[in-house]
């Protein structure tokens, strides 16, 4: 296929090359400051100037070359800044290890119960800087482990004050084992907190304006709460029903999950009936506008 006939595909190749360069060679390229916005901004400005200049002189080759470089760096930067640890407001740049931190957080999901503890993913917003005597905005979420039932204080649309020491999750030294720290990082979770009583996670206030994600979380929480408190089913059957309706499968027994794996129906737990119903309603609404 002649790429000259499809210039967009050739330019897309440069963009993809930038993404792959970050994935496989970020440790080599980062020290050379390729992530620096000033470099890409300068190249983009140069590209715009060359596009304007080509109307007066023949600069087709130069414009194409600069476009390739600009898209390569753009692809690299998009991946680079997806990693919150590269931001100046990253939570890791603000905390003091081995000291109790004050962090304003908000639930990202529902509470998960495992054995003798419960856990909750929370989104962090502000941290108190004792040296400066003020609150500072932060990026990077936290996984909270609790020895008491977090459901007793949980509200999906509320802000909390977390008072705890933050620890980085341990990474696997064996490259062939599951790396839990890397798994958490992909969910923007960089630190873990262990709390023992309710005073370490205090309710502050509810959020006044909700976006679609928060409305979805509230709906999910209400469905889970209804099944756990009102349905006369065994604990196993409740968890299966919750997983099928909401996609929340964290509390399913390993034996149940394996039975779904062996039957080839594990995807049913990932794409819940609730999600499918919402998608069906959306598609129906769109087509009703086209053909009433």
Regions found by a protein language model. Give the residues of each.
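Membrane-interface helix/helix-cap signal primarily in integral membrane proteins
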Residues: 2, 61-267
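Membrane-embedded alpha-helical segments of integral membrane proteins
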Residues: 3-55
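Hydrophobic alpha-helical transmembrane segments in multi-pass membrane proteins
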Residues: 6, 10, 18, 58-59, ...
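Alpha-helical transmembrane segments
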Residues: 19, 50, 72-76, 280
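Short hydrophobic/aromatic residue motifs in ordered secondary structure
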Residues: 21, 119, 171, 275-278
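Membrane-interface elements of multi-pass transporters and channels
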Residues: 24-28, 32, 56, 60, ...
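Short, function-defining helix-loop hinge/capping sites that tune catalysis or transport
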Residues: 26, 137, 280-283
